[in-house]
A protein has these predicted regions:
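Signature of N-terminal electron-transfer/Fe-S-associated modules in redox systems
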Residues: 2-242
Length: 242
């Protein structure tokens, strides 16, 4: 039996500075975003419930959050800039610095680490000549380390704009980012084809996504369900197995 040793230490520094950038949008951008925002807020009985999708909307405009985006959300939802900023800086999916066309996240949590996640992160940092939290000079790839991609059954996992690339190795991860930088992005293991970070942010805002295709879980995810079905297992309303 082979032994696995884990060394826990400080992760590379990642972007987390104050939100910077333009303080206001040009009129044409404001008009366009306002039309989208009206479509989004109409889904909610209380407009402020639309804050998260509106933050994705302004992120789709700038590639990150800016004072202009914060102000836009605050004005549309009758909130203060401070209230919007408090929410925006709580969630890691809202970026505080300009993000490349492809946000490449490497999981380094326990299972992915055991299966090689740390080696993948180290390989990509060397291959791209950047640290986690930085962007390549061509603006194509931003690298980050992630504590969990919620895909432990396919560890080690790399995500690109939150689409899954399962069972990765240092070699396959290098090939992946090379494809992204050359303009030939590979298809994810499952889910929708890749689009740019800004296009993904627009999708997360709840606007039409022309890329969506079957999103069923993979075989490994459903292994427990299949076994339960084969054994005739079920659950009663009180939660006790039968």
């Amino acid at each position: 039996m082979s032994e696995v040793f884990l060394e826990l230490g400080q992760r590379p520094d990642e972007a987390g500075p104050p939100i910077n950038g333009p303080a206001a949008y040009p009129d044409d951008v404001t008009d366009r975003l306002t039309a989208d925002a009206q479509h989004i807020t109409a889904r909610y009985p209380d407009a402020r419930s639309a804050l998260l999708p509106l933050l994705h909307l302004v992120q789709s405009e700038d590639g990150c959050l800016t004072p202009a985006g914060i102000r836009f959300c605050a004005e549309r939802l009758d909130l203060t800039d401070a209230e919007v900023t408090a929410v925006a800086t709580f969630y890691s999916m809202y970026r505080r610095t300009p993000t490349g066309d492809y946000l490449v996240g490497v999981c380094t949590n326990t299972l992915c680490a055991i299966m090689g996640g740390d080696a993948i992160l180290d390989a990509l940092q060397e291959h791209l000549d950047i640290h986690a939290g930085q962007t390549t000079a061509d603006g194509r790839v931003t690298l980050e380390h992630i504590e969990c991609n919620a895909a432990c059954d396919y560890a080690p996992v790399v995500m690109v704009n939150w689409e899954f690339f399962d069972n990765q190795t240092p070699s396959s991860a290098r090939d992946l980012v090379d494809g992204l930088r050359s303009g030939n992005p590979p298809d994810p293991t499952r889910g929708a084809p890749l689009c740019t970070f800004r296009e993904t942010a627009r999708t997360l805002a709840g606007l039409t996504d022309p890329h969506v295709r079957g999103g069923a879980p993979g075989a490994a995810t459903l292994a427990g369900l299949r076994q339960a079905q084969e054994l005739g297992m079920s659950a009663d309303p009180d939660g006790a197995s039968a």
